[in-house]
Structures are given as C-alpha cells and as structure tokens.
A protein has these predicted regions:
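ATP-dependent phospho-/nucleotidyl transfer catalytic cores
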Residues: 485
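C-terminal motif of bacterial Sec signal peptides marking the signal peptidase cleavage site
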Residues: 15-17
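Bacterial lipoprotein signal-peptidase II cleavage site
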Residues: 19-25
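Sec-dependent N-terminal signal peptides
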Residues: 5-13
Length: 751
C-alpha cells in the first residue's frame, strides 16, 4: 500500500531505518517499498568509470537537493576530473566540490582530511587506504574508515555548509589538514577562535577575474598547534596568500575521541561564509544528518512506487536522487534574509536567483521536463536565474559552470525556457526578458564562447542550414537543433500574441528538411552550393554530427515527427528505418576524432546495434514508434533499456549520467511515459515498470498510475484508461496529468 509522504516520514521517525546500516546500501529483504525512499539510494552508482569507458562518470555527492555545495571523498589527484573512482584504493581528502562532469571539471574546491602524523600534509603523503566494505555512501551521509590513519571520517550536509565527525586513535599527532588547493589560495588560522578561514581561486574556466570561494572551518575544541604550508614548504605565521596554501592543525586525542568540524563557504565574501555556517545552527552531527535525510525523503517521496523488485526500487530512487542534484543553487541568503548571488558572468554581487552547473544539450530532453512536472517551484527559481544570466552577460547560457563554458552545440536554452513558460512555471515578471533573450540568441554568437548563442546563424538564417563546407563542424547537429529551438520559441510567440514572430519561427523550424537525403533516408551534411557531402558514411561519428552519427541524429526532429515520417515514405518506411538502428552492426568510423571516444565503446558493448542510449541524441528515439503506430515496439525496447542498461551498482549507467538527464529518462520511463518534445503538451507512452506509482504534484493534485498485472513478462500495454476512459492513442497530456489523473494500464505478455 502506498502511504502519504507525511506518514512515511512519521513511520521513519518511529521505527527507524529499514535494513542494515552497514555497507553501501540498506539490506532490504522484501520487495515491498521501504518507509524511507532515501534508504534505497546508492550514491556510488556510476562511479566505476574512467576516460575510456563511462558507466556514469559520477561521484558520491553528499548534498541536499540542488545544494550550492556538494562534498565527496577524493580519490583522484588534485585537479583531476575523476575526483572519485570506484576502483581507487586511497582517499586524499573530503572535498567540497561544484563539479558537474569530469569533462567540465571543478571550481571553488578545497578539502579537509583527518590524519595521524605531523608530516603527512601533502595529498600524496596523507592519502589513506580504504575499503568499500567500511564505506557508507548516502545522499545525506558519508562515512569511511581511513586505514592508514586509523580514523573514521563522517560527514553530513546542508545547502551551503557541512558537519564532519572524526573518530581518532590515541595519538599526540592527530590532526586535520585543510587544503585550499593550488593556482592561488589563502589560509588564516584564528587560533583563539578554533577557526581556519581562507579562500580558493581554483577553477576550470567560466569565471570572472575576481572569482573566489571563501571558506570557514570551525573546530569544537582548541587547536593545540598548527603549521601553514605553501605546497610542501612550511611557512611561518598565522596566514598565507600563496600559490598553494594549506594548513595542518594538531590535537592530542585518546582512542575513540571525536573531533567535530563545521565548514561552510561563500562565493560572495568571508562574512557571507560565516553567515552560511549558520545553516548548521547549534545542531549536533546526528541532528544535521537526520534533517538531511528527512529533506531527501520529502523530495524523493514526491514519487512513490510499489510492486517492483528491491533492485528496481534502488535503481529508481538512485536515478531520482541524480535528477535532483543539478542545476545547483548559486545564490546565497544574507543576514537580513535577502537573496543575492555572485555573478559568474560579470563578477558583481547582485540581488536575485542564480543556478548553474548544467548543460542544456543534455538536460533539455528529460531533466527539465521532470522538474516542470514534479518540482516546478525549483524550476521557477532556475528560470529567474536564467533571466539574470541574460541581464548580466547578454546571453542565455548553454553550458554553465559556473559561467559560460565552451562545450557542446545547439541553442537549447530555448527549449528549457520555452517549456517552462508554456507550462506556466516561469515567474510572470521574467517572461518578457526571457523571450527577448531567446530571440537575441538566434542572431548572434558569444564573442569568446562559441557554443553560446548560435554559431553559424548567418548561414542558418539565410540558407536554412549550416553548410558542411564552410568550416563549422557538427553542422548537421547544429541545424537540426536550431530548427527545433525555433519551433520552441514559436510556441511562446503564439502564447504572447507575437504573430509575425511566430510565423517566421514556424517556417524556420522546417529547416531540418534541408538536410534530409532521400536516397539514404538519413540526415546528411550539405554544402553551400546545395550538394550533399561526399563521401558519406552513416557510421561516421562527429564531423557533421556531435558525439554520434547519422543513425543517431536523423531522429532529432522532436517537434515534427509526422513531417519526418512523411519524408521517409510513411509509417512503414519510418518504422523500417527505426528498426534498422537496432539491427545494423555497431561498426563505426572514428576518423574525425582520431581515436575511439568512450561513447562509441558504450554503444558497442550495449549490444543493441547502433542504438547509443549512453549518449543523449538517441534517448527519445524508442518513443518515436508510438507516432508510427507501433507502440508495442516502443514498449519492448523501453523495458530492454531499463532492464539491461541501468542498475544500482557502481557501473549502473551505460554512459555519462550527465547531470540528471540519463537518470530522468529512467524515472519517466519507469512511470510509463516520456516527453519526446519539450515545449509540447503530449507525453508518449511506454511500458511502466511498477504495478503502482503515485506522483504528488505541488498544486496538491496526485497522479495515480496503476498496472496491476505488471511483470517482466507482461511488458506490453493492452489497454490504457485515463480517469476511467479508454484511450485509443498511446499518449498522455500534461494538462490532464496536472489536474490529477488516474491512469490505468492493462498489461499483457506478447501474444
């Protein structure tokens, strides 16, 4: 039986957590849901990754949902994008991180490491062996035994602060290292206040010249002694501005004695870091941990599921956890309760919201549609932040971390902004600014970050496509995404009564047809003189496409699937081509890159032909069967992907998780529907994974999804009824769901 969220939390308080509290995940012995959804989450999913093969490229983030600061155990070297890898044997520190992806890397990071020894200060000498058998990784709590130091380290988060508890051995050489990292940092020891303050300037780009992350670290006992270093060189005095400032503070401890550390940071100022530390109040470690878990239970409990296996619950809630981390809050709250932010675009401290660390090329597809449906109040703040980003930089971001970053293609901020406006999520006062921003982005490109705005807009707006032979790479991908983005803006123009804009944009949205090759029935690069590129291989990755090939990108016509069906000769021809994606061998041409990129390997090992679920351009593809009158094929493949390519293990993804996108695909698919075209009202139906699900909407309504005959064999939808009325089409509308709908699936096996 599904219980209301409030009863779930009450039951958790009265009864405690279900299952074992040791190891990586709770040991739940039955297939009925736990009282606490947070107990199902493993933050280690996707961490068994490296440069050559991604099974998520994640790290175990100890954080609150959308929190400004995350914390993670650090196994990688300082500056490595792979901060934590499951196959590593040693931990170098507990790092405050803002990293969205190893490919984007980190900024504003520093670390705290408990040690035993006076000289074990730099990361090589202080690192300690650990075992996953003595590690617990939860969203709200992390603990590990640091074997070389004989210390148990624990941490629990708030949005901008964290509390740590270190259990020491008997030693007169116990200590804690605070490492502000290299590339310019500052440390000051305030001995009488049991406090260390400082800043780090480390970043990977996308920041103004005055960027700093100010931090404060406070101990619950007097500091016996301390030593500041610049790198490995000891420095006299109580403070240092240097290339690489770090400090070891010392204590004498009895065996089992605990030292509690409170830490916070601010991108605004040292005083604001002190203010952010107040998030912890006077709470002790267990109270902070309990509050963090309760917060996660509320957020994850917005969606309740039952009638699945324990492994399916673990995978589902681990994916929902990943779907509620990014984009992160980049705003702070001053002592008077005012919301303000350090602008990563112009370096000023300004009022209002700001969010960051997301790439819209990935997340427009599933993550933002999930926010609009289940967490619209969060996306309302994000949209207000996007309006601020435009005011502060003249552009909407496409990849923000924390400011504009040069990564990926497209102008998919238009999708993210449009879908929120059309679904009534965007604050009314920001709509005009955001509409202006979308139109402006069609006609220009950022002067230093060419992935922001529209590279090639002059060709696209005159020829109707970006030519293959004008020196702009990934031209087909750009054209297809610009066409879809124009359709999105057109829908907003209609809503706002901008009829001339709407007509112009609707026409431009048909530009995808300019790159369709009727001979191969695939999208293909086209030269400025109108001829198609030669030679042409549908297996060639990159070049005209982005991290994919023609088999992947031909389907990137989210807004006009019927038009694409017509180009392919109707439903039969369309279905034949879609079938072919799963049938053609996973061969490839990597000559554009000069080596086999990890996305190619992930496609190959999935054993699904040329279907590449590990990368975003293909993730909507299966649901296109619904538009061609073949919903059972969609249902088959959706289940295959969920069953074969996702799990709650460290290798639980089939490619980069990408800031909630690949996880949100699973969340939607497990519920039984998916938004193929953000900006539209219609979800395509797949195959629900659970026998029952309830979505608690912020407007007070609930969506109830029932599939009582559901099983691994009964993966096909024989009949679907919405509020008791049988639907003849495999689609659900957003407006119907928002009103609170009862959706019943009659599941059956293949006949």
């Amino acid at each position: 039986m599904i219980k209301p969220v409030s009863l779930l939390l009450l039951a958790a308080v009265l009864c405690g957590s279900c299952g074992s509290r040791t190891g990586r995940t709770a040991a739940i012995s039955c297939d009925e849901p736990s009282a606490r959804p947070s107990e199902y989450v493993s933050t280690l999913v996707g961490t068994h990754s490296d440069f050559t093969l991604s099974t998520g490229n994640t790290y175990p983030a100890v954080a609150l949902p959308w929190g400004m600061n995350f914390w993670t155990p650090q196994t990688g070297e300082m500056g490595s994008g792979w901060a934590y890898t499951y196959g590593a044997h040693t931990i170098r520190g507990l790092k405050q991180t803002h990293q969205p992806s190893p490919w984007i890397n980190d900024y504003g990071q520093f670390s705290i490491m408990p040690i035993r020894g006076r000289d074990k200060v730099d990361e090589e000498s202080r690192q300690s062996w650990f075992s996953h058998q003595s590690e617990e990784a939860r969203p709200y709590y992390y603990s590990v035994y640091l074997a070389d130091h004989d210390i148990k380290a624990e941490m629990a988060p708030t949005e901008r602060a964290a509390i740590m508890r270190f259990t020491f051995p008997e030693s007169d050489e116990s200590g804690v290292v605070i490492d502000a990292f290299d590339h310019g940092s500052y440390i000051r020891v305030m001995h009488d206040k049991r406090t260390v303050v400082g800043y780090t300037t480390r970043n990977s780009g996308g920041v103004p010249d005055n960027f700093k992350n100010w931090f404060i670290v406070r101990f619950d006992r007097k500091i016996r002694d301390f030593q500041i270093y610049d790198g490995t060189k000891p420095v006299e005095g109580e403070q240092l501005v240097g290339e690489h400032a770090l400090v070891r503070v010392g204590f004498e401890t009895r065996r089992g004695e605990q030292v509690t550390v409170r830490a916070a940071s601010s991108f605004i100022s040292q005083m604001q870091a002190v203010q952010n530390l107040e998030e912890l109040g006077k709470d002790d470690f267990e109270t902070v941990k309990a509050k963090a878990q309760a917060h996660w239970d509320e957020v994850l409990g917005r969606i309740e599921v039952e009638g699945g296996t324990t492994d399916q619950y673990r995978t589902f809630y681990s994916c929902l956890y990943r779907s509620t981390l990014f984009p992160r809050k980049f705003y702070e709250i001053d002592k008077n309760g005012n919301i303000l932010h350090y602008s990563p675009y112009n370096g000023e401290v300004l009022p209002g919201y700001m969010y960051t660390d997301t790439g819209f090329w990935d997340t427009f597809r599933s993550l933002f549609p999930l926010l609009n449906l289940v967490y619209p109040s969060v996306n309302a703040e994000i949209q207000a932040g996007l309006a601020n980003a435009y005011r502060e930089s003249g552009f909407l971001p496409e990849w923000a971390s924390p400011g504009h970053r040069g990564c990926m293609v497209g102008n998919n901020s238009a999708s993210v902004v449009s879908d929120a406006i059309l679904k009534g999520v965007t604050p009314e006062e920001d709509i005009a600014t955001l509409y202006e921003a979308m139109l402006a982005g069609r006609r220009k490109v950022h002067p230093t970050v060419s992935s922001t705005g529209r590279l090639g807009h002059e060709y696209y707006n005159t020829l109707g496509y970006i030519p293959y032979d004008v020196g702009i790479n990934e031209n087909v991908a750009r054209t297809l995404e610009y066409a879809y983005d124009d359709w999105c803006i057109a829908q907003v123009a209609k809503k706002l009564g901008k009829t001339n804009d709407a007509a112009m944009l609707e026409k431009a949205s048909q530009n995808y047809k300019n790159l369709f090759d009727p001979e191969t029935r695939l999208m293909r690069g086209r030269n400025a003189d109108g001829t198609f590129q030669t030679p042409f291989s549908p297996y060639k990755w990159g070049d005209a496409f982005t991290e994919g090939n023609a088999w992947h990108y031909t389907w990137s016509v989210f807004h006009d699937v019927e038009g694409l069906i017509d180009l392919m000769g109707g439903h039969k021809g369309f279905t034949r081509m879609l079938d072919s994606v799963f049938v053609v061998p996973p061969v490839y041409d990597d000559s554009y890159y000069g080596f086999r990129i990890h996305e190619i390997t992930e496609m190959q090992v999935a054993d699904m032909g040329n279907y590449a679920h590990g990368n975003q351009p293909a993730q909507h593809m299966i649901y296109l069967y619904d538009y061609a009158g073949q919903p059972r094929k969609a249902q088959w493949w959706v289940r295959e992907v969920m069953d074969r390519l996702y799990s709650a293990k460290p290798d639980g993804y089939c490619g980069d998780e990408d800031n909630g996108q690949t996880s949100a695909w699973y969340v939607f698919s497990a519920l039984g529907f998916y938004l193929v075209c953000p900006g539209a009202d219609e979800y395509a139906v797949g195959s629900p994974l659970f026998r029952k699900a309830v979505i608690h909407l912020e407007n007070g309504n609930t969506i109830e999804i029932d599939a009582p005959e559901n099983s691994s064999e009964n993966r096909y939808v024989g009949k679907m009824a919405i509020d008791g009325k049988v639907s003849e089409r495999p689609f659900l509308s957003y407006s119907t769901l928002l009103e609170g709908a009862k959706v019943r699936f009659e599941m059956e096996s293949e006949k």
